[in-house]
Regions:
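Helix-rich "cap/lid" substructures immediately adjacent to catalytic or cofactor-binding pockets
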Residues: 1-85, 134
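Alpha/beta catalytic cores of group-transfer enzymes, especially the acyltransferase/condensing modules
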Residues: 10-12, 37-42, 98-158
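An amphipathic alpha-helix/helix-turn recognition signal
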Residues: 30, 62, 88-89, 101, ...
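Short, glycine/charge-rich beta-strand/loop segments that flank catalytic centers
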Residues: 47-51, 85-89, 114, 126-130
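Hydrophobic side chains within alpha-helical segments
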Residues: 63, 70, 94-96, 116
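Gly/Ala-rich beta-loop-alpha elbow adjacent to hydrolase catalytic centers
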Residues: 67, 82, 86-90, 94, ...
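Alpha-helix C-terminal capping segments
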Residues: 73-77, 95-100
Length: 158
């Protein structure tokens, strides 16, 4: 049987993610610790005392570091996916799992991407949301009505 792995994008993060893996697995630790970042990855992922984990410049490297660590644990156990894919940010984790990037490269690229996205939105009153279980037509109608207040658009459908 062939295994396919789908890596999560932004939005699946939560404080404490990966902490038990980090404490238990040298393979997870090696992947997780491989990148050089300008913030304390452990503190943000495992504790999030300042509530910054949901800010894109922190979310993105945290999610990719977690995924790279999990991939390292799977590889250590002899589990090698035949197929990998990622949802948006998860593409970086999938590329690392496929051997295109090292964990260090994937995490550092995600940090760069997250910072660029945060900088692009800096000073702009903006936001985004995930809408679940609503058909496209009523969603488009809601966006059209809300457009009277400012720019409201559907970005993508997952």
């Amino acid at each position: 049987m062939k295994l396919a792995v789908l890596y999560a994008g932004q939005g699946a993060q939560h404080p404490g993610m990966g902490k038990e893996f980090y404490e238990a697995s040298p393979a997870f630790r090696a992947a997780f610790d491989s990148a050089v970042l300008d913030f304390d990855l452990h503190r943000v992922c495992f504790e999030d005392p300042d509530g910054v984990l949901n800010q894109t410049e922190y979310t993105q490297p945290c999610m990719v570091a977690f995924a790279c660590g999990v991939s390292a644990v799977l590889a250590e156990q002899g589990v090698k996916p035949a197929y990998v894919a990622g949802l948006s940010l998860g593409e970086y984790s999938a590329l690392e799992a496929a051997g295109v990037f090292t964990a260090k490269q994937a995490i550092e690229l995600a940090a760069y991407r997250g910072k660029a996205m945060a900088d692009a939105a800096s000073g702009i009153d903006c936001g985004m949301t995930a809408v679940l279980n609503l058909d496209r037509v009523p969603l488009a109608e809601c966006c059209e009505q809300a457009s009277a207040l400012g720019c409201v658009q559907i970005c993508n459908y997952n």
